[in-house]
Design a protein with these regions (language model features):
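NAD(P)-binding Rossmann-fold cofactor-contacting core
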Residues: 9-26, 160-167
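Rossmann-like adenosine-cofactor binding region
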Residues: 22-89, 208-215
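Adenosine-phosphate binding glycine-rich loop
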Residues: 70-129
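Hydrophobic anchor at the beta1->P-loop junction of P-loop NTPases
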Residues: 133
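P-loop (Walker A) phosphate-binding loop of NTP-binding proteins
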Residues: 136
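Conserved lysine of the Walker
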Residues: 141
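ATP-dependent small-molecule kinase phosphotransfer cores
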Residues: 158-219, 250
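A glycine- and Lys/Arg-enriched "phosphate-lid" helix/loop adjacent to the NTP-binding pocket
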Residues: 220-257
Protein backbone atom coordinates (compact mmCIF):
# COMPACT_ATOMS: atom_id res chain seq x y z
CA UNK A 1 0.00 0.00 0.00
CA UNK A 2 0.98 3.65 -0.28
CA UNK A 3 1.51 3.99 3.46
CA UNK A 4 3.82 0.95 3.57
CA UNK A 5 5.82 2.23 0.61
CA UNK A 6 6.30 5.65 2.19
CA UNK A 7 7.31 4.18 5.56
CA UNK A 8 9.85 1.91 3.90
CA UNK A 9 11.16 4.83 1.85
CA UNK A 10 11.63 6.72 5.12
CA UNK A 11 13.80 3.83 6.38
CA UNK A 12 11.42 2.33 8.91
CA UNK A 13 13.16 -0.63 10.57
CA UNK A 14 10.08 -2.77 9.98
CA UNK A 15 6.49 -2.29 8.89
CA UNK A 16 3.77 -4.60 10.22
CA UNK A 17 0.25 -4.71 8.81
CA UNK A 18 -2.46 -5.53 11.34
CA UNK A 19 -5.57 -7.17 9.91
CA UNK A 20 -8.62 -8.91 11.30
CA UNK A 21 -7.62 -12.44 10.25
CA UNK A 22 -3.92 -12.35 9.37
CA UNK A 23 -0.99 -13.63 11.39
CA UNK A 24 -0.70 -10.18 12.99
CA UNK A 25 -4.20 -9.25 14.10
CA UNK A 26 -6.17 -7.30 16.68
CA UNK A 27 -6.10 -10.23 19.10
CA UNK A 28 -2.31 -10.31 19.42
CA UNK A 29 -1.41 -6.63 19.45
CA UNK A 30 0.77 -7.30 22.49
CA UNK A 31 3.35 -8.67 20.05
CA UNK A 32 3.91 -5.13 18.88
CA UNK A 33 4.02 -3.22 22.16
CA UNK A 34 7.35 -1.77 21.00
CA UNK A 35 5.71 0.03 18.05
CA UNK A 36 6.98 3.59 17.61
CA UNK A 37 4.53 4.78 14.95
CA UNK A 38 0.96 3.65 14.26
CA UNK A 39 -0.94 4.60 11.11
CA UNK A 40 -4.69 3.99 10.93
CA UNK A 41 -5.58 3.20 7.32
CA UNK A 42 -9.07 1.90 8.16
CA UNK A 43 -12.34 3.91 8.10
CA UNK A 44 -12.86 3.24 11.81
CA UNK A 45 -13.90 6.48 13.52
CA UNK A 46 -14.95 8.20 10.30
CA UNK A 47 -18.08 10.36 10.14
CA UNK A 48 -20.87 9.53 10.85
CA UNK A 49 -19.59 6.66 13.02
CA UNK A 50 -17.42 8.85 15.22
CA UNK A 51 -16.14 8.03 18.67
CA UNK A 52 -14.54 4.63 18.03
CA UNK A 53 -10.88 3.74 17.62
CA UNK A 54 -9.17 0.76 15.95
CA UNK A 55 -6.72 0.31 18.84
CA UNK A 56 -6.05 1.40 22.41
CA UNK A 57 -2.88 3.49 22.22
CA UNK A 58 -2.09 2.95 25.89
CA UNK A 59 -0.97 -0.56 24.91
CA UNK A 60 2.03 0.94 23.11
CA UNK A 61 4.31 2.68 25.65
CA UNK A 62 7.04 3.45 23.09
CA UNK A 63 4.84 5.34 20.64
CA UNK A 64 6.43 8.46 19.17
CA UNK A 65 3.71 9.41 16.72
CA UNK A 66 0.39 8.43 15.14
CA UNK A 67 -1.24 9.21 11.82
CA UNK A 68 -4.90 8.78 10.92
CA UNK A 69 -5.90 8.91 7.26
CA UNK A 70 -9.44 9.85 8.35
CA UNK A 71 -10.03 13.60 8.01
CA UNK A 72 -13.66 13.86 9.15
CA UNK A 73 -13.88 14.38 12.06
CA UNK A 74 -10.71 16.42 12.37
CA UNK A 75 -9.84 14.51 15.54
CA UNK A 76 -11.01 10.90 15.62
CA UNK A 77 -11.14 8.95 18.87
CA UNK A 78 -7.76 7.51 17.79
CA UNK A 79 -6.27 11.00 17.49
CA UNK A 80 -7.98 12.31 20.64
CA UNK A 81 -6.38 9.54 22.69
CA UNK A 82 -2.99 10.39 21.22
CA UNK A 83 -3.52 14.02 22.20
CA UNK A 84 -4.41 13.05 25.78
CA UNK A 85 -1.34 10.82 26.01
CA UNK A 86 0.91 13.59 24.70
CA UNK A 87 1.79 11.67 21.53
CA UNK A 88 2.40 13.76 18.37
CA UNK A 89 -0.34 13.12 15.81
CA UNK A 90 -1.64 14.13 12.40
CA UNK A 91 -5.09 13.60 10.93
CA UNK A 92 -5.83 12.83 7.29
CA UNK A 93 -6.65 16.32 6.01
CA UNK A 94 -3.05 17.18 5.14
CA UNK A 95 -2.71 13.95 3.17
CA UNK A 96 -5.95 14.73 1.32
CA UNK A 97 -4.72 18.19 0.35
CA UNK A 98 -1.35 16.79 -0.77
CA UNK A 99 -3.13 14.23 -2.95
CA UNK A 100 -5.27 16.96 -4.50
CA UNK A 101 -2.15 19.03 -5.23
CA UNK A 102 -0.47 16.12 -6.99
CA UNK A 103 -3.64 15.36 -8.98
CA UNK A 104 -3.84 18.99 -10.11
CA UNK A 105 -0.20 18.89 -11.20
CA UNK A 106 -0.81 15.81 -13.35
CA UNK A 107 -4.04 17.01 -14.96
CA UNK A 108 -2.87 20.59 -15.49
CA UNK A 109 0.69 19.63 -16.43
CA UNK A 110 2.27 22.18 -14.11
CA UNK A 111 4.24 22.33 -10.89
CA UNK A 112 2.58 23.63 -7.75
CA UNK A 113 4.86 24.68 -4.88
CA UNK A 114 4.69 22.60 -1.71
CA UNK A 115 3.90 25.80 0.19
CA UNK A 116 0.43 25.66 -1.39
CA UNK A 117 -0.27 22.39 0.37
CA UNK A 118 0.55 24.01 3.71
CA UNK A 119 -1.49 27.13 2.93
CA UNK A 120 -4.60 25.26 1.80
CA UNK A 121 -4.37 22.79 4.69
CA UNK A 122 -4.25 25.61 7.25
CA UNK A 123 -7.10 27.45 5.53
CA UNK A 124 -9.33 24.37 5.42
CA UNK A 125 -8.48 23.44 9.01
CA UNK A 126 -9.61 26.86 10.23
CA UNK A 127 -12.73 26.94 8.07
CA UNK A 128 -13.86 23.45 9.10
CA UNK A 129 -13.17 23.86 12.81
CA UNK A 130 -16.07 24.66 15.10
CA UNK A 131 -15.76 27.39 17.71
CA UNK A 132 -17.29 25.94 20.87
CA UNK A 133 -18.24 28.17 23.80
CA UNK A 134 -18.50 26.83 27.34
CA UNK A 135 -19.06 28.68 30.57
CA UNK A 136 -21.35 29.18 33.52
CA UNK A 137 -25.11 29.61 33.05
CA UNK A 138 -25.90 33.22 32.21
CA UNK A 139 -22.35 34.03 31.09
CA UNK A 140 -23.53 35.07 27.63
CA UNK A 141 -22.55 32.04 25.54
CA UNK A 142 -25.58 32.22 23.23
CA UNK A 143 -25.20 35.98 22.72
CA UNK A 144 -21.47 35.72 22.00
CA UNK A 145 -22.06 32.77 19.66
CA UNK A 146 -24.61 34.73 17.63
CA UNK A 147 -22.30 37.74 17.32
CA UNK A 148 -19.27 35.64 16.45
CA UNK A 149 -21.24 33.73 13.83
CA UNK A 150 -22.41 36.97 12.23
CA UNK A 151 -18.92 38.45 12.24
CA UNK A 152 -17.26 35.31 10.87
CA UNK A 153 -20.06 34.40 8.45
CA UNK A 154 -20.71 31.09 10.19
CA UNK A 155 -23.83 29.35 11.41
CA UNK A 156 -24.66 29.70 15.12
CA UNK A 157 -25.83 26.55 16.91
CA UNK A 158 -27.05 26.13 20.47
CA UNK A 159 -27.21 22.85 22.38
CA UNK A 160 -30.07 24.05 24.60
CA UNK A 161 -32.08 25.04 21.52
CA UNK A 162 -31.34 21.64 19.98
CA UNK A 163 -32.63 19.88 23.11
CA UNK A 164 -35.78 21.98 23.26
CA UNK A 165 -36.59 21.49 19.58
CA UNK A 166 -36.15 17.72 19.80
CA UNK A 167 -38.13 17.27 23.03
CA UNK A 168 -40.84 19.87 22.61
CA UNK A 169 -40.31 21.63 25.94
CA UNK A 170 -37.85 24.02 27.55
CA UNK A 171 -34.69 22.86 29.30
CA UNK A 172 -36.14 24.09 32.59
CA UNK A 173 -39.28 22.02 32.07
CA UNK A 174 -37.23 18.95 31.18
CA UNK A 175 -35.14 19.28 34.35
CA UNK A 176 -38.22 19.80 36.51
CA UNK A 177 -40.06 16.87 34.92
CA UNK A 178 -37.28 14.30 34.51
CA UNK A 179 -34.49 15.48 36.82
CA UNK A 180 -30.99 16.72 36.06
CA UNK A 181 -29.45 13.27 35.41
CA UNK A 182 -31.85 12.48 32.57
CA UNK A 183 -31.48 16.00 31.21
CA UNK A 184 -27.69 15.51 31.01
CA UNK A 185 -28.28 12.40 28.89
CA UNK A 186 -30.40 14.46 26.49
CA UNK A 187 -27.73 17.16 26.51
CA UNK A 188 -25.00 14.69 25.55
CA UNK A 189 -27.17 13.41 22.69
CA UNK A 190 -27.55 16.97 21.40
CA UNK A 191 -23.83 17.65 21.79
CA UNK A 192 -23.00 14.42 19.92
CA UNK A 193 -25.05 15.67 16.96
CA UNK A 194 -23.68 19.22 17.04
CA UNK A 195 -20.10 18.06 17.53
CA UNK A 196 -20.18 16.30 14.16
CA UNK A 197 -20.89 19.58 12.39
CA UNK A 198 -18.15 21.70 10.86
CA UNK A 199 -17.53 25.42 10.53
CA UNK A 200 -20.08 26.46 13.15
CA UNK A 201 -20.10 28.50 16.35
CA UNK A 202 -21.63 26.34 19.07
CA UNK A 203 -23.02 27.62 22.36
CA UNK A 204 -23.34 24.92 25.01
CA UNK A 205 -25.38 24.61 28.17
CA UNK A 206 -23.61 25.63 31.35
CA UNK A 207 -23.62 22.09 32.72
CA UNK A 208 -22.14 20.31 29.71
CA UNK A 209 -18.72 20.37 31.40
CA UNK A 210 -20.02 18.06 34.13
CA UNK A 211 -19.75 15.07 31.79
CA UNK A 212 -16.25 14.15 30.61
CA UNK A 213 -17.55 12.46 27.45
CA UNK A 214 -18.81 15.81 26.17
CA UNK A 215 -15.24 17.08 25.80
CA UNK A 216 -14.38 14.57 23.08
CA UNK A 217 -17.72 15.13 21.35
CA UNK A 218 -17.06 18.87 21.13
CA UNK A 219 -13.30 18.76 20.56
CA UNK A 220 -13.41 16.23 17.70
CA UNK A 221 -14.20 19.07 15.30
CA UNK A 222 -13.73 22.13 17.45
CA UNK A 223 -11.65 24.45 19.57
CA UNK A 224 -13.24 24.96 22.99
CA UNK A 225 -13.26 28.45 24.50
CA UNK A 226 -14.25 29.23 28.09
CA UNK A 227 -16.23 32.42 28.67
CA UNK A 228 -14.98 33.45 32.09
CA UNK A 229 -17.19 36.02 33.78
CA UNK A 230 -17.19 36.91 37.49
CA UNK A 231 -19.95 35.06 39.33
CA UNK A 232 -21.38 38.38 40.51
CA UNK A 233 -21.90 39.38 36.87
CA UNK A 234 -23.87 36.25 35.94
CA UNK A 235 -27.60 36.36 35.30
CA UNK A 236 -29.64 34.76 38.08
CA UNK A 237 -32.83 32.81 37.35
CA UNK A 238 -34.18 33.58 33.92
CA UNK A 239 -35.77 30.16 33.59
CA UNK A 240 -32.68 28.34 34.85
CA UNK A 241 -33.76 26.15 37.79
CA UNK A 242 -30.19 25.16 38.69
CA UNK A 243 -29.01 28.77 39.01
CA UNK A 244 -31.96 30.34 40.78
CA UNK A 245 -29.85 32.27 43.30
CA UNK A 246 -26.41 33.82 43.64
CA UNK A 247 -25.50 31.25 46.31
CA UNK A 248 -26.42 28.44 43.90
CA UNK A 249 -24.24 30.02 41.22
CA UNK A 250 -21.26 30.37 43.55
CA UNK A 251 -21.52 26.73 44.61
CA UNK A 252 -21.89 25.64 40.99
CA UNK A 253 -18.88 27.69 39.90
CA UNK A 254 -16.71 26.13 42.62
CA UNK A 255 -17.70 22.61 41.51
CA UNK A 256 -17.21 23.15 37.78
CA UNK A 257 -13.87 24.94 37.63
Amino acid sequence: STVCAVLEEMSARSVTIISRKGEDNYNNLDRHADAEVIVNTTPVGMYPNCGVSPVDLSLFPKLEGVLDIVYNPARTAFVLQAEKLGIPYMSGLYMLVAQAKRTAEVFENRDIPDSETERIWKKLSLEMQNIVLVGMPGSGKSTVAARLAEKLDRIALDSDAEIEEKNGMSCAQLIEKHGEAEFRELESEAIAALGKRSGAVIATGGGCVTREENYDLLHQNGIILFIDRPVDALAVGGGRPLSSSMDALRQMEAQRR
